[in-house]
């Protein structure tokens, strides 16, 4: 009988016995109770939670910073737009007394006198050309009568009884008002009609 043919108890070859014993050894592992948790696993879980919280805070900070940046950019653009739009306001305010003087000169001029006709015509043309120039830059005159009083563009200085004009409407304009690109730079001084 050769060694290969040699059988161990119960007819098993020696290699089969070793493999079987090895399987038994692997099957026997120390049992870990639920109470025995590896402290490293606990620390890893804690660190992962801290990392997730830090990422969440960082994301919120970044979103807030982006929103602040967008708001600042939008405000700056609006400020620049307003600066361009209303840059002429100071200049126009300086021109208003000149325009008022030309208006008053026309009001008091004796238009019936033929000797003054060329001067009156010159004042009218000067006033017209000045108003045309300021209109090109967004200046509008507020001088309408028989319109409802608007506190945004009118300043009432007197109330007068009138049958021709409805109560609460502008009866007469004492001093013209002006707007620049829709913004009042000087309110019109007006008298307002009141009921009898």
From Swiss-Prot:
Transmembrane segments: none
Localization (cell): Cytoplasm
Keyword Aminoacyl-tRNA synthetase applies: no
Gene3D superfamilies hit by this protein: 3.90.20.20, Head domain of nucleotide exchange factor GrpE (2.30.22.10)
A GO term, aspect molecular function: adenyl-nucleotide exchange factor activity
Main location: cytoplasm
A Pfam family of this chain: GrpE
GO biological process: protein folding
Keyword terms, alphabetized: Chaperone, Cytoplasm, Stress response
Region (Disordered), start-end ranges: 1-41
GO cellular component: cytosol
Subunit structure comment from the entry: Homodimer.
Family statement: Belongs to the GrpE family.
Function: Participates actively in the response to hyperosmotic and heat shock by preventing the aggregation of stress-denatured proteins, in association with DnaK and GrpE. It is the nucleotide exchange factor for DnaK and may function as a thermosensor. Unfolded proteins bind initially to DnaJ; upon interaction with the DnaJ-bound protein, DnaK hydrolyzes its bound ATP, resulting in the formation of a stable complex. GrpE releases ADP from DnaK; ATP binding to DnaK triggers the release of the substrate protein, thus completing the reaction cycle.
Protein name, UniProt field: Protein GrpE
Species per Swiss-Prot/TrEMBL record: Klebsiella pneumoniae (strain 342)
Gene name of this polypeptide: grpE
């Amino acid at each position: 009988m050769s060694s290969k043919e040699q059988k161990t108890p119960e007819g098993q070859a020696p290699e089969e016995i070793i493999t079987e014993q090895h399987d038994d050894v692997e099957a026997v592992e120390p049992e870990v109770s639920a109470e025995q948790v590896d402290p490293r696993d606990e620390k890893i879980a804690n660190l992962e939670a801290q990392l997730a919280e830090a990422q969440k805070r960082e994301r919120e900070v970044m979103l807030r910073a982006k929103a602040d940046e967008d708001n600042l950019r939008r405000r700056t653009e609006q400020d620049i737009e307003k600066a361009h739009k209303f840059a002429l306001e100071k200049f126009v305010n300086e021109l208003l007394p000149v325009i008022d003087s030309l208006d008053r000169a026309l009001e008091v001029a004796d238009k019936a006198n033929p000797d003054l006709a060329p001067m009156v015509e010159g004042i009218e043309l000067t006033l017209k050309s000045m108003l045309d120039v300021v209109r090109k830059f967004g200046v509008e005159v507020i001088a309408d009568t028989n319109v409802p009083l608007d506190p945004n563009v009118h300043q009432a200085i007197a109330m007068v009884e009138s049958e021709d004009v409805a109560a609460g409407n502008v009866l007469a304009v004492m001093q013209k008002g002006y707007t620049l690109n829709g913004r009042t730079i000087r309110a019109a001084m007006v008298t307002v009609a009141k009921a009898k």
